[in-house]
C-alpha cells in the first residue's frame, strides 16, 4: 500500500482546467490585509469627539469643551480635533498629546476666557503658544513683560555687528582657559566702545581741534586692534556702553554661567602724535562651578 503524504507539484488537468481546490488556493487572501490593501478596502472615517473632551497632555490630565479647542481655526489644537487627524487615547480614554503639560492649563485658560499668565510664566507659556500655533496668544504675550522688553533689547543688539559670534567666543575662550589651567574660573579682556573713533589726545584737551583736521589718508594711522580677547563696537544708538555690558551679563547668565566684570582701564595705545586709544577695557570673570 502506498501512502500519499503530499500533492503532486502539478495538480492541474492536462486539458488546462482547474479543480475546485486549485481555484481556492489561487484566490486565497491573507488573513491580515497589507497597509495598501487596507487603505483601498477600508478608508478611514473622520474621528469623532465628544462635546466634553478629556485630555492627557504628557501625563497631566485636563478636561475642556470641544468648542474651546476649536475656538481659533488656524491653530494646531483646532486641526488636531477637527476629525481629520487620528489622536490616540490612553487606557482611560483620554486623548493623548505627547507634550509636557506643565503650562497647558495657561493655554486652556486663554482659549476659554482670554486670561493671560502672570509675568513669571510668560516665557514658558510663549513656548507652548508657539508649539500649538496660537497666534492671538502669541500677540498678547509679546506685548507683556519680559517679552516686550526683550524685543526692544534685540532691536538694539541688531545694530551690534557679530554680537552672537562674539558672545560665543567669550564662552569658548573662557572654557579653554579654565580647562588648560584646571581652574574653576577664567578671566578675559573685553573692549566695549560706542563711538566710531574713540580716540582723544592724551592728557591735552587743547589738542581736540586736531581731531577734526585729520585727512582721510591719516585715518589709517588711527586704525588698530586693541590687545583684548573680544571687542564690541561701534554702534549708533542711544544705548551706551553700560547697556551693552548688561546685555552681555544677561545672555551669559542665561547659559548658566556666573559672570563678574569690572573696568580695568583703557587701551592707551599710542597711535600718532599726541593721540592715544581711549577705548575702555573690561575684565570678565567666568566661573564654571
Curated annotation (Swiss-Prot):
Residues 1-35 are annotated as: Disordered. GO terms for biological process: intracellular glutamate homeostasis; intracellular potassium ion homeostasis; membrane hyperpolarization; protein homooligomerization. Changing residue 84 to W: Found in a patient with opsoclonus-myoclonus ataxia-like syndrome; likely pathogenic. Keywords: Cell membrane, Cytoplasm, Disease variant, Epilepsy, Membrane, Neurodegeneration, Neuronal ceroid lipofuscinosis. GO terms for molecular function: identical protein binding. Its main location: membrane. GO terms for cellular component: cytoplasm; cytosol; plasma membrane. SMART domains: BTB. It comes from the Eukaryota. It is found in: Cell membrane; Cytoplasm, Cytosol. Residues 51-149 form the BTB domain. Changing residue 184 to C: In EPM3; results in markedly diminished localization at the cell membrane and appearance of prominent cytoplasmic aggregates. It is linked to Epilepsy, progressive myoclonic 3, with or without intracellular inclusions: A form of progressive myoclonic epilepsy, a clinically and genetically heterogeneous group of disorders defined by the combination of action and reflex myoclonus, other types of epileptic seizures, and progressive neurodegeneration and neurocognitive impairment. EPM3 is an autosomal recessive, severe, form with early onset. Multifocal myoclonic seizures begin between 16 and 24 months of age after normal initial development. Neurodegeneration and regression occur with seizure onset. Interacts with CUL3. May be involved in the control of excitability of cortical neurons. This is BTB/POZ domain-containing protein KCTD7. It comes from Homo sapiens (Human). The lineage of its organism: Eukaryota, Metazoa, Chordata, Craniata, Vertebrata.
Amino acid at each position: 500500500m502506498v501512502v500519499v503524504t503530499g500533492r503532486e507539484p502539478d495538480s492541474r488537468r492536462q486539458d488546462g482546467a482547474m479543480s475546485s481546490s486549485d481555484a481556492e488556493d489561487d484566490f486565497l487572501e491573507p488573513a491580515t490585509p497589507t497597509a495598501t490593501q487596507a487603505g483601498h478596502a477600508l478608508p478611514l472615517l473622520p474621528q469623532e469627539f465628544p462635546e466634553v473632551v478629556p485630555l492627557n497632555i504628557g501625563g497631566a490630565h485636563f478636561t475642556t469643551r470641544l468648542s474651546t479647542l476649536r475656538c481659533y481655526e488656524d491653530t494646531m489644537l483646532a486641526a488636531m480635533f477637527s476629525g481629520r487627524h487620528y489622536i490616540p487615547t490612553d487606557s482611560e480614554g483620554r486623548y493623548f498629546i505627547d507634550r509636557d503639560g506643565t503650562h497647558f492649563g495657561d493655554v486652556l485658560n486663554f482659549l476659554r476666557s482670554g486670561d493671560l499668565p502672570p509675568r513669571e510664566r510668560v516665557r514658558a507659556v510663549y513656548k507652548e503658544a508657539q508649539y500649538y500655533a496660537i497666534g492671538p496668544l502669541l500677540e498678547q504675550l509679546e506685548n507683556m513683560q519680559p517679552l516686550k522688553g526683550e524685543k526692544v533689547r534685540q532691536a538694539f543688539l541688531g545694530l551690534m555687528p557679530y554680537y552672537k559670534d562674539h558672545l560665543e567666543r567669550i564662552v569658548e575662550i573662557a572654557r579653554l582657559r579654565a580647562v588648560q589651567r584646571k581652574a574653576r574660573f577664567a578671566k578675559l579682556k573685553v573692549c566695549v566702545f560706542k563711538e566710531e573713533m574713540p580716540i582723544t589726545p592724551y592728557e591735552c584737551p587743547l589738542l581736540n581741534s586736531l581731531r577734526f583736521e585729520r585727512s582721510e589718508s591719516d585715518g589709517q594711522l588711527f586704525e588698530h586692534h586693541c590687545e583684548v580677547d573680544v571687542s564690541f563696537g561701534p554702534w549708533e544708538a542711544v544705548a551706551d556702553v553700560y547697556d551693552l555690558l548688561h546685555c552681555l551679563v544677561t545672555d551669559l547668565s542665561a547659559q548658566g554661567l556666573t559672570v563678574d566684570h569690572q573696568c580695568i582701564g583703557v587701551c592707551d595705545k599710542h597711535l600718532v602724535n599726541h593721540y592715544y586709544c581711549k577705548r575702555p577695557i573690561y575684565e570678565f570673570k567666568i566661573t564654571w562651578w
